[in-house]
Structure formats: structure tokens, C-alpha cells
Amino acid sequence: DRDAKLAQADGKIPIEEFEYKVRRLINDYIRPPKNEYKLDRALWWMDRFKKELRTDVRIANKHDLFKAYEVENIIHCAAMSALASKERKESRWGLWHMRSDYPMKDDEHWMKHIVLKQGDSFDDIRISYAPIIKM
């Protein structure tokens, strides 16, 4: 139950410090230039942050609870971004998706959308592809 977070009033990490740490690590590992190592590290950190948010973060009041929901969503979006970036083995769209380990554009294999869909659980993210429809 998400509201059980209110029982974490004795957590060691204030939610504001935790949010700062999450945002800093996202900036370090998910922003361009990207590569497999950085994206793997990002996914490792997002998994760790999900666990820390449940066990170590201090949530003393409703304000902290709403902040925790926001940080939880930030972690989830960052994990999806890292997964999609890791899946695309090329560089495309200028700086937005520049991969140092795949520096060239590859229309033959990657002229398609990467579609992420959440499955039955928070951690179940499914990857599929969709064609680009030119109008």
C-alpha cells in the first residue's frame, strides 16, 4: 500500500536529500553522451533508489508523502528513459540521443519507435517497436 509510507517517520534520509541524490544521479548517468556502462549504472541506481524509498527515506507528514510520490515517479521515468536509450543502438536526434558507443545513425535497423509499456507491476516494463509513419 502506497500510503504505508507514512509509517516511515523514523527513516534516516530526509526526502529532500533523497530527491537531490536521485536527480543528481539521473543527470550523471542518463544525460548525453550516453553509453552502455552509464545506462547500466543508471538502471542499477534506479533499482536501488526504489528500495531505499521504501525503507530508508523519512516521511514524517503529508507534504513528505506527496514529495515521495513525486520522487517515485521521477525514478520510474528515469528507469524507462535509460531502458529505451539502452535499447537504441545508434545515435539520433542530435545531442538528445548521442551514444558514444554507437556514434552513427543507423536508419536500416533503427528507423522505428521504441515503445515502453508498464506491465502488471511497477518493475515490469515491456519493450516493443512501432514503425514510423511518414505523412
Predicted regions and their residues:
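Glycine- and aromatic-enriched mobile tails/lids
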Residues: 1-135
